[in-house]
Amino acid sequence: MKKSNRNSIDTPETFFVWSNELQDRFDPFFYRPVFKKLLAVIANNKTGTIHLKEAIINSVAGEWGEDPIDFEPNPDYELCYVVRNTNFHNDFNLDFSDVAQRYIKKSKAEKLALKKGDILIEKSGGSPIQPVGRIALVDDLPFDKPVVFSNFLQKMEVNKELFLPEYIFVYLQALYKIGYMDFIQNQTTGIKNLRLDDFFKILIIKPSMAEQKKVALKAIKSREEAKGLLEKAKTILASIDTFVLGELGIDLSGENRAG
């Protein structure tokens, strides 16, 4: 459906698809002209491209594990931190302020253990107003136990002879922000799922390593600066409230603070 420019009424978007264009899916969203145009722009890039599946050396699905509250530990399992969808920040990267702990089978924990440079993909989740497919880059892991990831996520290891993980991260993050993942998802029982076969067919523009580093560092630095400004703005806004109440004789410090 497409929004009319004149009002908020949904009006049908009509277009045609040649039979030889059809692949293994009949979802009309996948064949929308705007998506075809986006694919063409990427494919015709002068720098050259390769498919995402050719840019990685490994991809593995996650594991949710067992709840420590009602699981009886045994030597085959170990307590791990488990990164999940809620640890993804929509505008930045991973947020480790609330990381779950679960028992994971040791044989699986070894395969799933995250390390610096790994990329996580949100393959299931989303919301009515948010597509699935958010991207995260594993950097520092400030934990005293192994860190794995849930079954709603997928881990990729980048072929570092071809690409910098930081570049793949900012590239896929940019595609997510412009709505690319909208076209390669489907929905069942309220949960959106990323079509991984289509995801790994994403064309990755392949500049030189020097250019990859330049692009990645600039993007990451800019997002860090934006995050800092956001935190500063929150502090300023809170100080305004404190000032106003203070001028009115309402002291929120010490015993007079509510809650």
Please tell me what each predicted stretch does.
Residues 116-117:
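Loop/turn positions that initiate beta-strands
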Residues 1-67, 201, 208-259:
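Non-catalytic DNA-recognition/assembly elements of restriction-modification systems
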Residues 108-113, 127, 142-145:
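Short, surface-exposed secondary-structure edge patches
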Residues 127-137:
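Short, Lys/Arg- and Gly-enriched loop/turn segments at beta-strand edges
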Residues 65-73, 98, 183-185, 255-256:
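Short coil/turn segments at secondary-structure boundaries
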Residues 41-91, 107-109, 126-127:
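Low-complexity, Lys/Gly-biased intrinsically disordered segments
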